[in-house]
UniProtKB/Swiss-Prot annotation:
Its EC number is 1.17.7.3. This is 4-hydroxy-3-methylbut-2-en-1-yl diphosphate synthase (flavodoxin). Coiled coil: none annotated. [4Fe-4S] cluster binds at residues 269, 272, 304, 311. The lineage of its organism: Bacteria, Pseudomonadati, Pseudomonadota, Gammaproteobacteria, Moraxellales. PANTHER family: 4-HYDROXY-3-METHYLBUT-2-EN-1-YL DIPHOSPHATE SYNTHASE, 4-HYDROXY-3-METHYLBUT-2-EN-1-YL DIPHOSPHATE SYNTHASE (FERREDOXIN), CHLOROPLASTIC. One of its GO terms (biological process) is terpenoid biosynthetic process. It comes from Acinetobacter baumannii (strain ATCC 17978 / DSM 105126 / CIP 53.77 / LMG 1025 / NCDC KC755 / 5377). Keywords: 4Fe-4S, Iron, Iron-sulfur, Isoprene biosynthesis, Metal-binding, Oxidoreductase. Transmembrane segments: none annotated.
Length: 371
């Protein structure tokens, strides 16, 4: 087994509702609703779909006082920590703090006067709410645009440090920071620079990454690269797609780096003329059927005996394609043969049995350690 070489950057730990961010806390995955916030039913339904996909934290845009009231109604109907996304109007921040927000996404520099910022900080402190400073390459301050000519890593850093200084001077330290851009290299440069300057937890993201496919690639490169360097404490994959897809991709990135597991890690061959069954169809069916599984597990599905045995030996459950019957491995050992035409049903049954075994063992260990 290859040891994971990733060493996370030490950061302070803050709390977003029931979820800790930074320090030794797991890297959390979050998304943002794209419904009209005032449509409470639609927003709640979307949040619940994201939670089913594994979301640790959800963000909701609150552009008006009417939306703030809707936020309060949403807060009562979901249990996942909620971040209220606020711009310009400090009164909205004060309202959602009273309505039960777990975190405020604001930039202190665009909330208004020092007095307004102090009021927001006082409300956050009173309610035990954290904040996120969110710097974006598309909305840099005009003087920084003039100074640097274009968005640069240094410009994003300078903007972030301005906002950080405001909170530091008010002795408020329960915040995380993001410095997002739509360009992979700019994003990575900004986060690297920021990570050298502060010990606050960092919220990773590539903003306006694009549609599903291109946005996934951009995010995997930028965020995956930063995570490999130990940078990042929470993340959002920003896509022009459904928010639950963002959650799934976020966990796939973490899973690929061995940083966190959420469900099945499928190992499957790309298929060729040696395949003894239609690997693509089998994998599509398995991913759909087993989407609800949250227990970490490796499942290998290889269409022939060339690479199949080697992959199967490293998986919890492995299948090596053959006709008319395929060979099953369990925990790295040969187990039994199954009808190749019944692969999907048989693999699903084995996976669910294995999940039950693992969860029962986990429960017994918890009881044993607490007694």
């Amino acid at each position: 087994m290859i040891e994971n070489p990733i060493k996370r950057r030490p950061t302070r730990k803050i709390r977003v509702g029931s979820v800790y961010v930074g320090g030794d806390a797991p890297i959390s995955v979050q998304s943002m609703t794209n419904t009209e916030t005032c449509d409470v039913d639609a927003t709640v339904a979307q949040i619940e779909r994201c939670v089913d996909a594994g979301a640790d934290i959800m963000r909701v845009s609150v552009p008006s006082m009417e939306a703030a009231e809707a936020f309060g109604a949403i807060r009562k109907r979901v249990s996942v920590p909620l971040v209220a996304d606020i711009h310009f109007d400090h009164r909205i921040a004060l309202a959602v703090a009273d309505y039960g927000a777990d975190c405020l996404r604001i930039n202190p520099g665009n909330i208004g006067s020092d007095q307004k910022v102090r009021e927001v900080v006082a409300a956050a402190r009173h309610h035990g709410i954290s904040m996120r400073i969110g710097v974006n390459a598309g909305s840099l301050e005009k003087d920084l645009q003039k100074k640097y000519g274009e968005p640069t890593g240094q410009a994003l850093l300078e903007s972030a440090l301005r906002h950080i200084d405001i909170l530091d001077r008010l002795d408020f330290h329960e915040f995380k920071v993001s410095v997002k851009a739509s360009n992979v290299f700019l994003t990575m440069d900004a986060y690297r620079l920021l990570s050298q300057q502060i010990d606050n937890p960092l919220h990773l993201g590539v903003t306006e990454a694009g549609i599903y496919r291109t946005g996934t690639v951009k995010s995997a490169i930028a965020l995956g690269g930063l995570l490999m360097e130990g940078i990042g404490d929470t993340m959002r994959i920003s896509l022009a797609a459904e928010p639950e897809d963002e959650i799934k991709i976020g966990f796939d990135i973490l899973k690929s780096l061995g940083l966190r597991s959420n469900g099945i890690n499928f190992i499957a061959c790309p298929s060729c003329s040696r395949q003894e069954f239609n690997v693509i169809q089998v994998m599509q069916a398995l991913e759909e059927r087993l989407e609800d599984i949250r227990t970490p597990m490796d499942v290998s599905v290889i269409g022939c005996k060339v690479n199949g045995p080697g992959e199967a030996k490293e998986a919890d459950i492995g299948v090596v394609g053959a006709a008319p019957r395929s060979l099953v491995y369990r925990n790295g050992e040969k187990s039994h043969l199954i009808d190749t035409n019944q692969l999907v049903d048989e693999i699903e049954t084995m996976v669910r049995q294995r999940v039950q075994e693992l969860e029962e063992a986990k429960s017994k260990e918890i009881i044993r350690s607490s007694s």
